[in-house]
Every structure is written in C-alpha cells, then in structure tokens.
Amino acid sequence: MEFDPVKINTSSIDHVTILQYIDEPNDIRLTVCIIRNINNITYYINITKINPHLANRFRAWKKRIAGRDYMTNLSRDTGIQQSKLTETIRNCQKNKNIYGLYIHYNLVINVVIDWITDVIVQSILRGLVNWYIANNTYTPNTPNNTTTISELDIIKILDKYEDMYRVSKEKECGICYEVVYSKRLENDRYFGLLDSCNHIFCITCINIWHRTRRETGALDNCPICRTRFRKITMSKFYKLVN
C-alpha cells in the first residue's frame, strides 16, 4: 500500500504538530506528534502516541550496549548532547493529546520503526515523517549569537508555571492566615518573599510588618523564625521561578 499525503490531517497544540493519517477503507489510523526544535534544527517524534510499548522498549534498548553505542555516535554526528536526543512531555490534562516520549527522528527512522511488526504501519510512518520534514525545512535567519527557544522549551516553561500556580493558590499568609490568592483586593494577591527563609506572607502583611519594625528601630526579621532579612520581593508565586 502506497503512502498518500491526501489522507493527512494536520493540527497543532502548544507548538506540537499532530499528523493524523486516516485511511478508512483500509481501516488504518495513525497519529504522529512532532516537535521541531529550532535550536538544533531537528525534529522529535512522540513514540508513546504511536504505541506505548515502543517507549518502554526504547528505554530498555537505550540501556543496552548497542543502544548506548548508537546514542553516543548519534550525539557525535549531530553535535547534540545525548540528554537532548530525547525529551518528555508529562501527562496532565493540558497535555493529554501530546504527552509522551519524544525522540530524535533519526532514532525513529533507523531504530524504532523496525520494532513495528505491521509493515503497512511502518511504511505510513516513514512516509509521514519524510513528508513532514520535506514540507517543514527550516532555514535559520537569526544571527549566530542569537539564542532561540525551542517548542519543547516553551512547553516546559508553561508546565513549570502551571505547577507553580497550582501550589501557590493554596498558600496562606503566615500573618493574617488568609489564602493569598483569595484576598479581596487584587493588589493584595501577591506574595512577599524574604531572602532569608521560605515562610509565606502576603505582600501587604509583610510590608506592614517591615514598616513597623523600621519605625520602632527593630531589626528586619521574619515574623515566624526571626531570621534577619535584607529585602522583600513581590511575587505572584510563593517562591521565585528560575
């Protein structure tokens, strides 16, 4: 059976391209998620979405001598660190359609594809990957000293902020004992972070504490642990995000 580009449906979620190959007369449905990494101008393919067993087998293969040698050689030939030849998007509600193990397309075409027993699926997968790469060739137009951010990096950043928000929205101020995000005034819904400890305060309460201490000539210290601090940082999250 020949690969037919007409049967491809393309969509995207959070910088992930989703290719769906649908051939209803032959009862064939194949979904391939691809991320194009602009930093090293290559492509990463989600093998979990193709078949979860492929991801498990890849992890086992990578630990064996043949896998380690292949990864070492691929890293050398591409100039990409071994740790950057694979990426993972975690499973959560926001990522339910794109989560999984993404690996360098070379690993898919030259290694993983041979683990697929259905030769028709093999052929279609190879055709999908080659079709996508041929139609999405990237030519850099930024100066060599300009650092670009990849789609995977963007997703990781969004995940980090989502996690930080989820934890922050439950935090209470250690002075007024109110949930910081539930305060009546919007300007009060910020944390005041001390550089000396990790105790939680809303920006309003810790500023009042700080001002009162200054007015009375007392030391600037944490209301809970009494550790002296030098500055207060206003933040939307309960701790600084690196």
UniProtKB/Swiss-Prot annotation:
Known catalytic reactions: S-ubiquitinyl-[E2 ubiquitin-conjugating enzyme]-L-cysteine + [acceptor protein]-L-lysine = [E2 ubiquitin-conjugating enzyme]-L-cysteine + N(6)-ubiquitinyl-[acceptor protein]-L-lysine
Zinc finger (RING-type): 173-226
Signal peptide feature range: none
SMART domains attached to this UniProt entry: RING
KilA-N domain span: 21-131
Classification via Pfam families: KilA-N, zf-RING_2
GO molecular function: acid-amino acid ligase activity; ubiquitin protein ligase activity; zinc ion binding
Stretches that traverse the bilayer: none
GO cellular component: host cell cytoplasm
Main location: host cell
Keywords tagged on the record: Host cytoplasm, Host-virus interaction, Metal-binding, Modulation of host cell apoptosis by virus, Modulation of host ubiquitin pathway by viral E3 ligase, Modulation of host ubiquitin pathway by virus, Transferase, Ubl conjugation pathway, Zinc, Zinc-finger
Enzyme class, broadest EC rank: transferase
InterPro entries recorded: E3_ubiquitin-prot_ligase_p28, KilA/APSES_HTH, KilA_N, MKRN-like, Znf_RING, Znf_RING/FYVE/PHD, Znf_RING_CS
PROSITE patterns: KILA_N (PS51301), ZF_RING_1 (PS00518), ZF_RING_2 (PS50089)
UniProt-listed SUPFAM superfamilies: RING/U-box
GO biological-process terms attached to the record: protein polyubiquitination; symbiont-mediated perturbation of host apoptosis; symbiont-mediated perturbation of host ubiquitin-like protein modification
Highest taxon listed in the record's lineage: Viruses
EC number per UniProt: 2.3.2.27
Intracellular or extracellular location(s): Host cytoplasm
Function, as annotated: RING-finger E3 ubiquitin ligase which catalyzes the formation of both 'Lys-48'- and 'Lys-63'-linked polyubiquitin chains. Plays an important role in virulence by acting as an anti-apoptotic factor.
Family of the protein in this entry: Belongs to the orthopoxvirus OPG021 family.
Protein name listed in UniProt: Host range factor p28
